[in-house]
Design a protein with these regions (language model features):
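Rhodanese-like catalytic fold shared by cysteine-dependent sulfurtransferases
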Residues: 406-417, 421-453, 459-492, 496-542
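Mid-to-C-terminal Rossmann-like scaffold of FAD/NAD(P)H-dependent oxidoreductases
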Residues: 1, 7-8, 21, 274-385, ...
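Rossmann-like dinucleotide-binding cores of NAD(P)H-dependent redox enzymes
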Residues: 59, 146, 154-210, 290-293, ...
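A Rossmann-like FAD-binding core segment of flavoenzymes
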Residues: 25-27, 74-92, 97-98, 165-259, ...
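Glycine-rich dinucleotide-binding loop and its adjacent helix/turn
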Residues: 107-166, 201, 257-259, 471-481
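Beta1-alpha1 glycine-rich phosphate/pyrophosphate-binding loop at the start
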Residues: 1-73, 112, 161-183, 318, ...
Length: 542
């Protein structure tokens, strides 16, 4: 039996390796269109800046290793130009024809290249292959001073950081009003503040119009000089072969597969960035170009080829990215997605230290949590300096097992002062959600502050700044100053992070107040959003 694998990236290599471990007699051939196989694509931005200083480290496996260890033949520079499903053959480089019993289609995705004037400038690159990175390093070695990154996704943000690491004047341009689309504006604002503090010229709500000589011209008319530019505005599934041979393509442009990763042809499987998968939260088809899911899908294909009933159980979209000193992580749906899908939801923000506050060097982490009135988990996001991905991973695991906010509340997690608090942030998110569901607290948010009575409940002398037009009534005095708090108006209480205002709101709710809210995330989140907002306003004045 012969199995052909088209594409030697994460999904293809994973499928081939698993298949060999299950069957030592099968003939397995990987057909790779480029001269590289199984490279660490996700590390390319760090290789470009010499944070990863060895090219060899970027090669996860070699053709020799595949042959010596797994007895898998890898053919480089072997572009499949046609699939003949009826005859079960493929054509390589428009010349050689080879037959298959099973075919695994993992061609990946192509970077989006806008059709604008000057886009073929020799110093404009995408970051998809090791060859791309080599070319980028070659330009950087020629005393490059100005870098422009078009696109504020994960790769764009990572490339901007690594250009700054090399000492380049760096501009990042993003067409949307925020970077990092998988998270919401509040989490993105924290990351945007960090990028600006580190020296990135961040231009949001603006896009590439054309390239004029050695300048990037934006839709706004701004002109940015560059020695090197990166296109990181997204990817599209590579489906040319699939379309030409008549495989079913989904509404989002990816190859349609079932839960066994089988295409509309029972002899052809597909995985990785080229396929559409089912979203864990919404149940709708989605495109998730991530290495983790691609590797799992490859393994599932191998199992099914060998008769092991293995299914792909939807995609949660768990992701993490380094933004200078910050870490941003997320799982599930964000608020934008929930609004678009019509899913009803509740939300809360908390800011908690990375470990026990009394132990040295604790740093704050901002969390956003989305859930339903029934306690179902819809999504979580976090941004901080330490332990961020650890908490999101725990929530992702609870979600994967169809757990609820009550499972978060009850989770027994590791604790010692250098690592966490007795009530871990995962526990605290569950507790906050439970309080909201039970009506013990009504959360208010940044956009709710207008036309509300604002009460700063922090103790006098314990703070340097407050929210404009607020009055200060400390929690310790609130029972004796009820006459200063109106019952006929919306009242929003706030403190540093939201805990004291929750306590104060409980007092008022039990004193007959019904229109009392606690500012979720407190004034610390308010300051994060204000800093970002003011930075954007300053740009409009330039």
């Amino acid at each position: 039996m012969r199995t052909l694998v088209i594409g030697g990236g994460a999904a293809g290599a994973s499928a081939a390796a698993r298949l060999r471990r299950l069957d030592d007699n099968m003939e397995i051939i990987i057909l790779e269109a480029t001269d590289e196989i199984s490279i660490a694509n996700c590390g390319l931005p760090y290789y470009c800046s010499n944070v990863i200083n060895s090219r060899q480290k970027m090669i996860v496996s070699s053709t020799k290793r595949f042959k010596d260890l797994l007895n898998i033949e890898v053919r480089l520079n072997s572009k499949v130009t046609k699939i003949n499903r009826k005859e079960k053959t493929v054509v390589i480089n428009n010349s050689e024809t080879i037959n298959y019993d099973k075919l695994i289609l993992t061609p990946g995705a192509n970077p989006v290249i806008p059709n604008v004037k000057g886009i073929n400038h020799p110093n404009i690159f995408t970051v998809r292959t090791l060859r791309n990175a080599d070319d980028i390093k070659s330009v950087l070695a020629r005393d490059a001073k100005n870098a422009v990154v078009i696109g504020g996704g994960f790769i764009g943000v990572e490339m901007a950081e690594n250009f700054v690491h090399l000492g380049l004047n760096t501009t990042l341009v993003e067409l949307s009003s925020q970077i990092l689309a998988p998270v919401d504006t509040e989490i993105a604002a924290h990351a945007q503040n960090e990028m600006r503090r580190k020296g990135v010229n961040l231009l949001l709500s603006d896009g590439l119009k054309e390239v004029d000589g050695e300048e990037i011209v934006l839709n706004s008319g701004k002109r940015i000089p560059f020695d090197i530019a990166i296109l990181a505005i997204g990817v599209r599934p590579e489906t040319t072969l699939a379309k030409e041979c008549g495989l079913k393509i989904g509404a989002l442009g990816g190859v349609k597969v079932d839960k066994n990763m089988r295409t509309s042809d029972k002899h052809i499987f597909a995985a990785g960035d080229s396929v559409e998968v089912e979203d864990f939260v919404s149940g709708k088809d989605t495109l998730i170009p991530l290495a983790g899911p691609a590797n799992r899908q490859g393994r599932i294909i191998a199992d099914n080829i060998k008769g092991i009933k293995s299914t792909y159980k939807k995609t949660q979209g768990s992701a993490v990215v380094k933004v200078f000193d910050l870490t941003v992580a997320n799982v599930g749906n964000n608020e934008k997605q929930l609004l678009k899908s019509g899913q009803k939801y509740l939300k809360t923000f908390i800011i908690k230290p990375s470990h026990a506050g009394y132990y040295p060097d604790a740093t704050p982490t901002l969390y956003k949590f989305l859930f339903t009135q029934k306690g179902e988990i819809l999504g979580a996001q976090a941004c901080g300096y330490e332990g961020v991905e650890k908490r999101i991973d725990v929530i992702a695991t609870i979600m994967r097992n169809n757990g609820t906010i009550y499972d978060m509340l009850d989770s027994e997690l590791c604790y010692a002062p250098p690592y966490s608090s007795a009530k871990d942030p995962v526990n605290m998110l569950g507790m906050h959600a439970e309080n909201i569901i039970n009506g013990f607290v009504k959360p208010a948010f940044y956009n709710d502050l207008k036309d509300s009575v604002l009460v700063d409940i922090r103790e006098q002398g314990s703070f340097d700044s407050t929210i404009e037009a607020s009055v200060n009534i400390p929690t310790s005095q609130i029972r004796g100053r009820l006459n200063e708090i109106p019952k006929d108006k919306k009242v929003i209480l706030f403190c540093n992070t939201g805990f004291q205002s929750y306590v104060a709101s409980r007092i008022l709710l039990q004193k007959g107040y019904t229109n009392v809210y606690s500012l979720s995330g407190g004034i610390e989140l308010y300051h994060i959003l204000k800093e970002n907002e003011n930075a954007e306003k300053e740009l409009t004045l330039v």
